[in-house]
Design a protein with these regions (language model features):
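Residue-level signal for secondary-structure boundary elements
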Residues: 16, 97-100, 215, 298, ...
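Alpha-helix boundary/capping detector
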Residues: 34, 46, 232-234, 400-407
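Acidic, S/T/G-rich, low-cysteine, solvent-exposed domains in lumenal/extracellular/periplasmic regions
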Residues: 94, 110-386
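Juxtamembrane amphipathic/hinge helix adjacent to a transmembrane helix
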Residues: 380-408
Length: 443
């Protein structure tokens, strides 16, 4: 892949300590050797007007340093290559892994396998730990035993009063935590009803310490996802033959592109919150918004129960005054410190296997924007801002090599005109004008 080859050569020019060797597996006949070190070919379908074929493509990068190595197993473009290279080289030089511990405090604790896989693919070494109240044996590891390792918590359905006290102490004493949870849970496998147990309430009160106050509402937005529903009744409840309907569901929010989510991302039954920094300052903390809804967002208050039925949930606010922008993710930073100690993401379902699968085109095309934000959050907690800036860097121009055979003649003519004909014409024009002025001056 020419883009990748050119980028690697440019990357090596920046330092005398970096060298690049390009190897063509078909010419070197080393496909078997590559397979032994974890590099395999990927079948790529190519087609033209006359034929179609499948080619086994090798496009991997192996980085060697003092007898150790790291591998990027497959790369076809340079959209994030600088980030991947820098991360791998940094890991080799510093001789350390990037550990992160994960606690599943959700009611569906086994529903986050995709998040685990994504974290590992991004170079993190995942350690599954438990809440202190759930430690059953000496084999189990409680999250507070690994105070130097950043912590991810999914859900809040299992918190005890003791867990909340230990977590608060963990954060205030220097621990780094990314929490993804609403102050309630959704019965996603059945009727989508909203439940709030004592554990959710304890978690909600814990957030008061950081100046975060959950609204007793569900958050809706005009910018939302369209879902597919099957129904055997009409809008009045009368029976009719089974049919499929596509419904805009305001409780599944599509966050628009913003500073901390350049491609936007999806939220499922999120609970917005207010921030009170006068309360946070008691512990010498400051909380700031990271993600927010659109300005056409509104809240559904709890009556007897929250309305979550896609056919019954209001599609808009009752009045214009109810529309506003609401915080759905925030970070809390200690006084005189640059890096946050806590990131609260007000939705545990955006990282779950069920909703990631539902919101994706196929198992090979998962909507990973929320998982990407999760990884970014760990970089923020670790103070790796420079690495994060490389990850979100998007100003690559590779259009020179993105020309089809059918358009190559026209592209060549345009290139020749721009680089040869146009400069000659400009120089001749300048010379002619200068000649006329000189001639008039001599007269």
């Amino acid at each position: 892949v020419k883009d990748v080859t050119d980028f690697l050569q440019s990357y090596a020019v920046e330092s005398k300590q970096v060298s690049v060797e390009i190897i063509n597996p078909s010419k070197e006949n080393i496909a078997k050797k590559l397979s032994e070190i974890g590099i395999r070919g990927y079948p790529i379908r190519t087609s033209s007007a006359d034929s179609a074929s499948i080619t086994n493509v090798y496009s991997a990068i192996k980085i060697d340093y003092l007898g150790k190595s790291e591998t990027i197993p497959f790369v076809l473009n340079i959209s994030r290559l600088e980030f991947d290279l820098t991360r791998k080289i940094k890991s080799l030089i510093e001789e350390k892994e990037n550990p992160v511990q994960v606690v599943c405090a959700s009611s569906f604790a086994n529903g986050y396998s995709l998040a685990f896989q994504y974290l590992e693919a991004e170079g993190f070494s995942v350690i599954q730990t438990s809440l202190p109240s759930e430690k059953n044996s000496s084999v189990d590891i409680s999250f507070d035993e690994l105070s130097d390792i950043p912590l991810i918590i999914f859900g809040s359905d299992k918190f005890t009063k003791t867990d909340c006290k230990i977590l608060e102490k963990f954060i205030l004493n220097g621990g780094k935590v990314f929490i993804a949870s609403q102050p309630y849970s959704i019965d996603f496998e059945d009727n989508w009803s909203v439940k709030q147990n004592e554990s959710n309430q304890l978690f909600e009160r814990l957030m008061f310490t950081f100046g975060i106050y959950f609204k007793q509402t569900l958050t809706c937005d005009i910018s939302n996802l369209r879902i597919t529903m099957t129904s055997n009744s009409d809008v009045n409840g009368n029976k009719k033959s089974a049919h499929t309907e596509y419904i805009n569901y305001p409780l599944w929010i599509s966050l628009r592109a913003q500073e901390n989510a350049l491609s936007g991302l999806s939220l499922f039954w999120p609970c917005a919150f207010d921030i009170d920094n006068e309360v946070a300052e008691i512990e010498r903390l400051k909380t700031t918004t990271l993600l927010f809804t659109s300005n056409r967002s509104w809240q559904i208050p709890r009556t007897e129960n929250f309305i979550t039925n896609p056919f019954a949930v209001p599609k808009s606010a009752e009045s214009e005054e109810e529309y506003s922008t609401f915080a759905v993710c925030a970070s809390t930073t200690k006084e005189n410190e640059k890096d946050p100690s806590l990131i609260l993401f007000a939705d545990q379902y955006a990282f779950s296997d069920s909703l990631l699968s539902y919101n994706s085109n196929s198992i090979f095309d998962v909507d990973s924007r929320s998982l990407d934000f999760l990884c970014n959050g760990i970089f923020m907690l670790n103070g790796e801002d420079e690495l994060l800036s490389l990850k979100t860097k998007t100003t690559f121009n590779t259009t020179l090599y993105k020309i089809s055979n059918e358009n190559i003649r026209n592209a060549a003519i345009k290139t020749l005109f721009t680089t040869c004909v146009l400069p000659i014409f400009i120089n001749l024009t300048i010379g002619f004008v200068f000649f006329l002025k000189r001639r008039r001056f001599n007269k």
